[in-house]
Amino acid sequence: MLQDATLTTLASLDTNTVSDALDFMGLPGATFGLRPLWNCPKIVGRASTIQLGPKTGTAPTVHLISPVIASVTTDDRILVITGGTEGISCWGDILANAAKMKGIRGSVIDGMSRDIEGSESIDYPVYGRGLTMISARNRLIQVASGTPIVVAGVTVCEDDYVIADRCGTVFVPAAKIAEVLALAQRIASRQDGMVQAVRAGQSVEDVMHDKKFEAIKG
C-alpha cells in the first residue's frame, strides 16, 4: 500500500489529538457514534463520499455503493456513507469483499451494517452506528456520490481526510490538513510531556490547568 507523507503523519496520530486540533482551530470534524463495528484497526485515508436515500419506486436499480467501489483506482480511499435508516443495513460482506479487492481501506457508515463477521474475516475495517440483519434491498438506494454529504452532523467533501480508531471517527477538510496536522503534532508532543510530568510526581491540578493547554497554540 502506498502512503504519502500526509497520510503517514495522520496515521501517527489518534482521533483524540486530531479532534483537539480541530477544537483549537474552531473547525468541525469530530463525530460521535461512528465506532468500529468489529475489533478493527485504525484507518486513515481520503473520503469517497456516498449519499443514500429511501427507495420509492419498484423498478430494479444498481445495488447501492457498488458503482463507487468499481470506480476506485487508488489505494488511499475510505468509503464515507450517509443516509442510512435506523435498523436497515447499508453495508454487508459482499460489498466488503469487493472493496477489499479494490484496495479500499475501510468504510465509515452513518448507518448500520450486516454480515459483520464477513467483513471481520477478511480484515476489512467498518465503522458505523451499529449492527442489524435487515437488508437494504428495496429499502435504500444510492442517490449521489463524490458530492458533499453530512455525516453525523459534519459536512464531508470528496477527498477530505479521514481518521477512525476505537474512540470514533474524525474528518479533516482537505484544505486545512497541513495546519491541522502541524497543530496536532504539537498537541501530541505537549500531552506526552504532561503525562511524563504526572508520572514524575507533579500535581495533576497544575499539569492540566487551562493555561497549559493554551500554551499548545504557541
Whereabouts are the PLM-identified features?
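Feature captures the catalytic cores and cofactor-binding loops of soluble hydro-lyases/lyases
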Residues: M1-E158, V172-Q202, H209-G218
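C-terminal binding/interaction regions
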Residues: V162
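Channel- or pocket-lining gating/hinge segments that regulate access to a cavity or pore
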Residues: G168-V170
